[in-house]
Regions:
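Intrinsically disordered, low-complexity regions of eukaryotic proteins
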Residues: 8, 15, 45, 58-62, ...
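Short, intrinsically disordered, charge-balanced linker/junction segments flanking boundaries
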Residues: 11-14, 171, 175-179
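Structural signature of tandem-repeat unit edges
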Residues: 1-2, 73-87, 100-117, 127-143, ...
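Extracellular/surface-exposed low-complexity segments
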Residues: 1-25
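Short, well-ordered beta-strand segments enriched in hydrophobic/aromatic residues
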Residues: 29-33
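Generic structural motif
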Residues: 18-22, 119, 145, 171
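LRR N-terminal entry segment and analogous cap-like coil->beta motifs
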Residues: 36-120, 124
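Short beta-strand elements of solenoid repeat domains
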Residues: 97-98, 121-125, 147-151, 173-177
């Protein structure tokens, strides 16, 4: 470990952690970056790994030994906190996959995508999401955009004119079932 005059130590994130926190009371998933990750917060995923906040919860047993099936958390709002602007995720794979109640994404300008290689299924199944502004996405390193907007049925318009797709290897079903 080496000293770093800005924040103490050298590490991949400069001593900072990028994470997502879910507030069950409001249905809000908030992305932040800070010196420590709070208990219960989710690490960001890498590559083709499904993010922890989109995985099914462990099934629960009630007193009669019946199993309550695992369910995904129900995300209705997403916030990218200003602190997240300095995070550099490498994958956005399935970040909001099947978030059928997601209506709003606040602060998406704080999502820096310059190092992202996978945007597959990022917004797939977001049936009621509208509007969505991806005009500032840096896609120069993205290789997978498959199913990125599948079944985004409420989107009235989507500006992808700034997308750099030179490295994209898979765009299959990118806009399938969009109106």
């Amino acid at each position: 470990t080496y000293a770093n005059y800005e924040n103490g130590y050298f590490s991949p994130e400069g001593g900072f952690h990028a994470y997502a926190e879910f507030n069950e009371g409001t249905g809000t998933l908030t992305f932040r970056r800070g010196l420590s990750k709070p208990a219960g917060a989710y690490d960001l995923n890498e590559g083709n790994a499904t993010p922890e906040w989109r995985k099914e919860k462990e099934p629960e047993h009630n007193n009669d030994e019946f199993i309550v099936p695992g369910v995904k958390i129900d995300i209705s709002n997403v916030v990218f906190d200003a602190s997240f602007a300095n995070a550099r995720p490498t994958s956005c794979y399935k970040w909001f996959d099947m978030c059928t109640s997601l209506t709003e994404i606040e602060g998406i300008e704080n999502l820096n995508t310059e190092k992202v290689t996978n945007m597959g299924s990022m917004f797939s199944g977001c049936h009621v999401l509208n509007p969505l502004d991806v005009s500032n996405f840096d896609t120069q390193n993205v290789e997978d955009m498959s199913e990125m907007f599948v079944s985004c049925m409420k989107l009235k318009s989507l500006n992808v004119s700034n997308f750099d797709t030179q490295k994209v290897k898979n765009m299959s079903s990118m806009f399938y079932n969009c109106n």
